[in-house]
Amino acid sequence: MYRTADHKPKLALFSLFVVFATTFLLYAGGFTTSIGAGMAFPDWPLSNGSLNPEGWLEDQAMLAEHSHRLLGASIGLLTLCLAVWTWKKDSRKWMRMLALASLVTVVMQGLLGGFRVLFNNLQFAMIHACLAQVYLCILVSIAAAQSAWWRRPILVGIGESAWWRRTSMRANDGMTPNRVKSLGLILCSLIFTQLIVGAIMRHSGAGLAIPTFPLTPEGDLIPNNWTFPIAIHFAHRAIAVIISLVYLCWAIRIIWNESIDPRIKCLGFLGIILIFTQITLGALIILTYRSPIPTTFHVFLGAYLFALTWLITFFQFKDEVVPIEPY
């Protein structure tokens, strides 16, 4: 086995744990919105004036919202630990800035969630939903940069010189790391735009504005009548088509390129799976008249598609050659 001189396994493992724990928070938040439980309690930060409100385990709306709050507080504490640990043990300035950004973002998330309740304002809920995606990507960036993989993207000649060579990532079809990065940034922008549109659609109650799939009730691709709910819903579908086509082209070129790290190829293949899963879930939302389970998973996997795309892109920013040493 090999490792880099600066690799800190415990910190790397903890950063992965925070990403894993955030998975539950994202699902809880998505489910809370899916069942319309965002205002299950009229107060904040307490719930009905208590940390353990009466009857919250028996009422679905109260259970969803209070669980979301408890998970949010727990993730906040984990993020604080991660930020402090990173500042103490990691000398890279940009890593410290990422750790600080994660802490600032999670505090902002908590405040936005509170403002959504105190002011009963869906605009805060929309911003809260979008910032959650940014927070997840920051955590993924920290976890990636703490990994041994970050320091040596491609291993050449295990048992020989054992050096990681970024130059070997140059593709014979022009799919260089810079090209992967550029197209990845474009895709991240498209997906984040889609997440914003989805949040607006979701919180404005337009999830069934076009109640049939894939065509409109009139049997057309484009609606005959236009209102804001129909327009935002159609925009969500149209952007999904664009993202799917661009993503497939990007990921397939990565997978077919022999000189790209096999692990990056695996991530690209996983992205393709998520794309088709998202299309299926989007259809199920319509066909089940917005059942909470497919709706929540559609939101949840959308966040991880964004994070996965960013992860592939983020790895292309690392261009140092780092030697490794045996344990």
Model-derived features with residue positions:
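Polytopic transmembrane helical bundles with strong interfacial aromatic enrichment
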Residues: 1-157, 162-164, 168-327
